Amino acid sequence: MRKRIKPAVLLVFFIGIISFLVLSRTIADLQARERQETTKTIPNPNTPRKTTTASSSSKKEEDINPELVGRPIIDISGWQLPSEIDYDVLSQNVGGVIVRVHSGAQAKKENAATYLNGLDKSFKTHIQEFQKRNIPVAVYAYVAAKDKKEMEKEAEEFYKAASPYKPTYYWLDVEEKTMKDMNAGVEAFRAKLQALGAKNIGIYIGTYFMEEHSISTDKFTALWIPTYGFDDGYYNAAPDTNTEYDLHQYTSQGQLNGFSHYLDLNQIAPTQDQEAIYRKLFKVQKDNSS
């Protein structure tokens, strides 16, 4: 006769089998997971490494404000009195400002806009007020010396007065013949300015004057051309020239909120990349290099 197995023994037996299966599955899962983690940590020799390099430009540059790119650019001097300007309002309507610092050696006596030494009476206020409102500022000097030595002296005075404000560009305003070889005089001014430390130097000149007096623009890094069309306060047409230029002064009769009198209005050449040229002329650098 067969011996009966007690139910309690069977229960213990089945519980043991089930526990063994569960434990085996758990161990297998853990081993598989460990193999996966090990595979992840082993670099694939065929996978290119990612390298992180610091951008040199990010150390020096601040990006431009894109809202400013399409706005008019104005050039002003002591003839635009600070007391008549609402800088808060005008700053909302311009993309950049070019401020006269030196009026040239033609000054015979002091006037409302200029000291006898040629320095503009309002340049400091204009620069400071616009810079406080985050409007980029460039500067210009009217070139009117009678020989190369005097040209270099004016360049020194211009740079000494303007450089503390770290302008984005230095412009030479060339409108009249004041010495026999005007091209040599302009180059003497430019070269002296560069030797003093100015890196961005442009020239403002009419195409007719440039051709008539053989003024070379090759060593300048930017060209600013005045042509007014009807001079009615609006942009009429691009300058009639094959010369590549950066900035166009298109009217002397412009009107903008923030100033109740006429202003010179300028725009970036329509044939150029607007943002690229704006960045070239008006980008402020973190290290404020001139």
Which role fits each region the language model picked out?
Residues 42, 48-87, 221-290:
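Functionally critical loop-and-helix segments that line ligand-binding/catalytic clefts
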Residues 78-88, 113-129, 148-162, 208-212, ...:
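Alpha-helical scaffolding within the catalytic cores
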Residues 147-163, 177-192:
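Alpha-helical scaffold elements lining the catalytic groove of polysaccharide deacetylases
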